[in-house]
């Protein structure tokens, strides 16, 4: 198996297991809207359900569930095709795409299973609250950042 495939599979498996395990743990041990302060004034574990996307985008859209499922499936396909085009030495890009893939898949599993996504990571400062998120959302963000770093590295590699 090519190194990029080993990286991709390991990152997808690890990230997806962590995402789903934390969501099951939150769902089984906390009441909806319950909040547990972790770092006072900065971070709490707060059990929420999100019917929309980031920032509850399209939460009230009547066809939101089929729309988000379709978008997720298309995104997974695009990521898979993009991954297959990587060179054997593009380890960072493989890990980045794996994080994005696992994040999209983790939230897709929630949407299919529950009709919404479990969010629980609650970051805030004084009166400012960042919208709650989960491990899958974090994986997507980290993956996108790593992909940007890889693209910059690739451009520098190509430069004379």
From Swiss-Prot:
User: Which EC class is the enzyme in?
Assistant: hydrolase
Q: In which pathway does it act?
A: Protein modification; lipoprotein biosynthesis (signal peptide cleavage)
Annotated compartments:
Cell inner membrane
Q: Which UniProt keywords apply?
A: Aspartyl protease, Cell inner membrane, Cell membrane, Hydrolase, Membrane, Protease, Transmembrane, Transmembrane helix
Please list the residues that make up the active site.
119, 137
Q: How does it sit in the membrane?
A: Multi-pass membrane protein
Single Gene Ontology BP term?
Answer: proteolysis
Broad class of where this protein is predominantly found: membrane
Purpose: This protein specifically catalyzes the removal of signal peptides from prolipoproteins.
Q: What is this protein called?
A: Lipoprotein signal peptidase
Upper taxonomic classification of the species? Answer: Bacteria, Pseudomonadati, Thermodesulfobacteriota, Desulfuromonadia, Geobacterales
